[in-house]
Amino acid sequence: MAYPLQLGLQDATSPIMEELMNFHDHTLMIVFLISSLVLYIISLMLTTKLTHTSTMDAQEVETIWTILPAVILIMIALPSLRILYMMDEINNPVLTVKTMGHQWYWSYEYTDYEDLCFDSYMVPTNDLKPGELRLLEVDNRVVLPMELPIRMLISSEDVLHSWAVPSLGLKTDAIPGRLNQATVTSNRPGLFYGQCSEICGSNHSFMPIVLEMVPLKHFENWSASMI
């Protein structure tokens, strides 16, 4: 989860988030190099007073500043497209969970089980226990097995919502009348927090998401106790 004054991204929990962080570093380095070059040229012009008032045509320079930006854009676009395709791929999911957005809570249905469904509301501040997080705790967590591909089907009952868990690299719109899907795969156990990331009304800020990733054996015990 995020902390006050945090400058970096949250720790990656899924392969997709690891790829996104690598892509972020790759793109940031390109931006840093271009910015440094531009600032160096500007400072050089201001300090040396070098100008070329007589230059009317420079075919080589024009060729370079046409080809070079194209190469840079390709270097950014190719890794980005690769990650986009990875995010859309869902290979043999072991579990499917249907998520519905409401004003202002989430409901979950484990479609592989007959009667495993529940609503998930934010815990009011007055009901928090010591150590729990304000505006992030819920009464019913989404319990999922770790290290296994899980398909999330996401939609909405009323207005636009967005189901987002940053540490897993997830952000999928919940649109009324449309079923979107995403893949959840966690490399480690733990609690992972998210929130609705689409302004959906007066209580938009009070729609937290909590995923509890556990070993498969613990998940089987939990699901048996819930049915």
From Swiss-Prot:
Q: What is this protein called?
A: Cytochrome c oxidase subunit 2
Q: Where is the signal peptide?
A: none
Q: Does the keyword Transit peptide apply?
A: no
Sequence positions that bind Cu cation A2: C196, E198, C200, H204
Query: What organism is the protein native to?
Result: Zelotomys hildegardeae
Q: Which residues bind Cu cation A1?
A: H161, C196, C200, M207
Function summary: Component of the cytochrome c oxidase, the last enzyme in the mitochondrial electron transport chain which drives oxidative phosphorylation. The respiratory chain contains 3 multisubunit complexes succinate dehydrogenase (complex II, CII), ubiquinol-cytochrome c oxidoreductase (cytochrome b-c1 complex, complex III, CIII) and cytochrome c oxidase (complex IV, CIV), that cooperate to transfer electrons derived from NADH and succinate to molecular oxygen, creating an electrochemical gradient over the inner membrane that drives transmembrane transport and the ATP synthase.
Which reaction does this chain catalyze? 4 Fe(II)-[cytochrome c] + O2 + 8 H(+)(in) = 4 Fe(III)-[cytochrome c] + 2 H2O + 4 H(+)(out)
Subunit record text: Component of the cytochrome c oxidase (complex IV, CIV), a multisubunit enzyme composed of 14 subunits. The complex is composed of a catalytic core of 3 subunits MT-CO1, MT-CO2 and MT-CO3, encoded in the mitochondrial DNA, and 11 supernumerary subunits COX4I, COX5A, COX5B, COX6A, COX6B, COX6C, COX7A, COX7B, COX7C, COX8 and NDUFA4, which are encoded in the nuclear genome.
